[in-house]
Amino acid sequence: MDVLHAHDLYDEQLIDRVGDAVNEDAGDDLDTLVDGQQQQQRVGFNRQMDILLDAPQEPPLGVFPAQGGPNGPPRLRKKRSFYTMTKPTPPCQSQEPEMCLLMASVTRAMRHVREDQRGEYFANYLVENMTSQNYPNGVGLPQHWGQL
């Protein structure tokens, strides 16, 4: 086997020398060296193309930055939940809550009182003003719990 291999190597050298003689070359293999340098330069210029041609048939990662690439590892998309999605509120919910006339007048009057006296003022105002004289037949008083 070794003899056969050595014989093939000798034949290749002989063919190279014959090629030099045919081309009227000096036999210094300068043309082979130049061809090798040109081949190396071609490989350097087309390295990216060679990588792409040798790659499996998949798109490069740079095309889809979400899959990874220069910005870092891929990010998982947040899965939306029906309960956490914000929805536009109807205009009736964005307004102030329903309030009876008595409560509206109490809050208006309490704006002029200091904060430490507001609780006492609130109770006194209701006792003084929640009378049948001010609200005949209960008109303007709270009709159900939570309205006051």
From Swiss-Prot:
Keyword Glycoprotein: yes
GO biological process: sperm individualization
Swiss-Prot/TrEMBL keywords: Developmental protein, Differentiation, Glycoprotein, Spermatogenesis
Chain spans, region Disordered: 56-78
Pfam families in the record: SOTI (PF17079)
Annotated glycosylation sites: N129
Recorded coiled-coil stretches: none
Keyword Glycoprotein carried by entry: yes
Top-rank lineage group of the source organism: Eukaryota
Summary of the function given for this chain in its UniProt record: Post-meiotically transcribed gene that has a role in late spermiogenesis; required for actin cone progression during spermatid individualization.
Family: Belongs to the male-specific scotti family.
The protein's name in its UniProt record: Male-specific protein scotti
Organism name: Drosophila sechellia (Fruit fly)
Name of the gene encoding the protein in the UniProt record: soti
